[in-house]
From Swiss-Prot:
<keyword id="KW-0131">Cell cycle</keyword>
<feature type="region of interest" description="Disordered">
    <location>
        <begin position="86"/>
        <end position="113"/>
    </location>
</feature>
<keyword id="KW-0175">Coiled coil</keyword>
<keyword id="KW-0479">Metal-binding</keyword>
<dbReference type="InterPro" id="IPR006612">
    <property type="entry name" value="THAP_Znf"/>
</dbReference>
<keyword id="KW-0238">DNA-binding</keyword>
<keyword id="KW-0805">Transcription regulation</keyword>
<dbReference type="Pfam" id="PF05485">
    <property type="entry name" value="THAP"/>
</dbReference>
<dbReference type="GO" id="GO:0045786">
    <property type="term" value="P:negative regulation of cell cycle"/>
</dbReference>
<comment type="subunit">
    <text>Interacts with HTRA2; under apoptotic conditions. Interacts with ABRAXAS2.</text>
</comment>
<comment type="function">
    <text>Has sequence-specific DNA-binding activity and can function as transcriptional repressor (in vitro). May be a regulator of cell cycle: THAP5 overexpression in human cell lines causes cell cycle arrest at G2/M phase.</text>
</comment>
<protein>
    <recommendedName>
        <fullName>THAP domain-containing protein 5</fullName>
    </recommendedName>
</protein>
<keyword id="KW-0862">Zinc</keyword>
<keyword id="KW-0863">Zinc-finger</keyword>
<feature type="coiled-coil region">
    <location>
        <begin position="349"/>
        <end position="382"/>
    </location>
</feature>
<feature type="compositionally biased region" description="Basic and acidic residues">
    <location>
        <begin position="91"/>
        <end position="113"/>
    </location>
</feature>
<keyword id="KW-0539">Nucleus</keyword>
C-alpha cells in the first residue's frame, strides 16, 4: 500500500511522519460528486486542478463537526467540505526567518552608506594620498552583491597616510558607459577602516570593507602576507562564492593580477579581478606584471534555500519513498542483484516443494500396499489418513 500524504498546498502531513499523540486521517476527493468537488477545490484555491483517486486531504483541513466518530474511527460525513487552509502568501508573511534576514540586510546597508560618506568627506581635505586601482568586470549581468576585505599584518609604528581607492565597474557587451567610484581611505597608526557602497542603474552593488593598521607601503617593505577575500552572490544560481588569496613574495612587486573563472554562474566568459599595489621606490606602471604562482584560491559554495525549493525537495522525497524503483541512488547493477536473489529463492522453494510431494506420494503408496496385504484395519487407516490431511494443511 502506497503511503498517503496531503495534497493541499503548504501542508506536509503524511502517514507515519507525524507525532504519535496526533491522530491524522486521510480522505479521498469526492470525484463522483461534482458539486461537492467544486467546493473542495474552490476552498483550496485550485479551481482548475483535477485530482485523482490516489490523492487525499488530511483531517487538519476539516472542522470537527465534519467528522463522525464511530467505534473510535473518524468517518467523513457525506456533506463535509474542507474550510481550513493556509495559503502560500500567509506562510510567507508569517515566516520569521525571512523577515529577520530582510531587516538585517536593510540595517547593514544603512550602516555602510553613511560611513562611506563620512570617510570620503574627511579624506578630501588631506594632502598625502596613495592610489589603488581596482578594475572589476562583472562576472554576470545579474550580479547582486560583491565585497572585498583586505587584511594587512599586525599594527606597527609608522607615519599617517591617506589612501585613495578607485573602483572602475566596466560593463562588457553593453552599450552603457563605464561607471567610476572614487572612495578615500584614512589610515592611522592605530586602526583605520573604511566602508563604501555603490549602486548603478542595473542594481549592481559593490561594498568594500578594509581594516588596516599600517600602510600598504609598509606591508610590502616587511614582505608579509596580503589577504584578499571576495564574496559573490548571483541571482540565477542562489550561490555564494568565497575566494581567499594569499601572496607572499621575497622581492617588492609592482602589480598582481588575479584571474577567477566561476563555473557555477553558467557562463563561459572569464571574470578578472585585478588588484594593483604600488611598490617601494617606484611608480606604478600599467605594462609591468609579476606572475603570482604562490597564490592560493579557496572557493566555497553555500546554497540558499527558499520555500519554493523546499517544496520541490519534499515532492521528490515523497516520490522516492513511494516508488523505490525510481530512486536515484539505485543503479542497474543493484537492481539486477536483487532479481538474481529473488530467482534463487524461488528455485529453492520449488525444490522443497518437490521433495515434500515425493514424500507424500511415497507414504500414499505405502498405505495402499498395506491395504492390499490386509495388514491394517480400517480404524488404523483412518488415523493415518487424518494424519496425512493435517500434514498437508500445515505444509500449505
Amino acid at each position: 500500500m502506497m503511503p498517503r500524504y496531503c495534497a493541499a498546498i503548504c501542508c506536509k502531513n503524511r502517514r507515519g511522519r507525524n507525532n504519535k499523540d496526533r491522530k491524522l486521517s486521510f480522505y479521498p476527493f469526492p470525484l463522483h460528486d461534482k458539486e461537492r468537488l467544486e467546493k473542495w477545490l474552490k476552498n483550496m484555491k485550485r479551481d482548475s486542478w483535477v485530482p485523482s483517486k490516489y490523492q487525499f486531504l488530511c483531517s487538519d483541513h476539516f472542522t470537527p463537526d465534519s467528522l463522525d466518530i464511530r467505534w473510535g474511527i473518524r468517518y467523513l460525513k457525506q456533506t463535509a467540505v474542507p474550510t481550513i487552509f493556509s495559503l502560500p502568501e500567509d506562510n510567507q508573511g508569517k515566516d520569521p526567518s525571512k523577515k529577520k534576514s530582510q531587516k538585517k540586510n536593510l540595517e547593514d546597508e544603512k550602516e555602510v552608506c553613511p560611513k562611506a560618506k563620512s570617510e570620503e568627506s574627511f579624506v578630501l581635505n588631506e594632502t598625502k594620498k596613495n592610489i589603488v586601482n581596482t578594475n572589476v568586470p562583472p562576472q554576470h549581468p545579474e550580479l547582486l552583491h560583491s565585497s572585498s576585505l583586505v587584511k594587512p599584518p599586525a599594527p606597527k609604528t609608522g607615519s599617517i597616510q591617506n589612501n585613495m581607492l578607485t573602483v572602475n565597474l566596466v560593463k562588457q557587451h553593453t552599450g552603457k558607459p563605464e561607471s567610476t567610484l572614487e572612495t578615500s581611505v584614512y589610515q592611522d597608526t592605530g586602526i583605520g577602516d573604511f566602508h563604501t557602497c555603490f549602486e548603478d542603474l542595473n542594481s549592481t552593488t559593490i561594498t568594500l570593507t578594509t581594516s588596516n593598521s599600517e600602510s600598504i607601503h609598509q606591508s610590502l617593505e616587511t614582505q608579509d602576507v596580503l589577504e584578499v577575500t571576495t564574496n559573490h552572490l548571483a541571482n540565477p544560481d542562489f550561490t555564494s562564492n568565497s575566494m581567499e588569496i594569499k601572496s607572499a613574495q621575497e622581492n617588492p612587486f609592482l602589480f598582481s593580477t588575479i584571474n577567477q573563472t566561476v563555473e557555477e554562474l553558467n557562463t563561459s566568459k572569464e571574470s578578472v579581478i585585478a588588484i594593483f599595489v604600488p611598490a617601494e621606490n617606484s611608480k606604478p606602471s600599467v605594462n609591468s606584471f609579476i606572475s603570482t604562482q604562490k597564490e592560493t584560491m579557496e572557493m566555497e559554495d553555500i546554497d540558499i534555500e527558499d520555500s519554493l525549493y523546499k517544496d520541490v525537495d519534499y515532492g521528490t522525497e515523497v516520490l522516492q519513498i513511494e516508488h523505490s524503483y525510481c530512486r536515484q541512488d539505485i543503479n542497474k547493477e543493484h537492481l539486477w542483484q536483487k532479481v538474481f536473489k529473488l530467482h534463487s529463492k524461488i528455485t529453492l522453494l520449488e525444490l522443497k516443494e518437490q521433495q515434500t510431494l515425493g514424500r507424500l506420494k511415497s507414504l500414499e503408496a505405502l498405505v495402499r500396499q498395506l491395504k492390499q496385504e490386509n495388514w491394517l484395519s480400517e480404524e488404523n487407516v483412518k488415523i493415518i489418513e487424518n494424519h496425512f490431511t493435517t500434514y498437508e494443511v500445515t505444509m500449505i
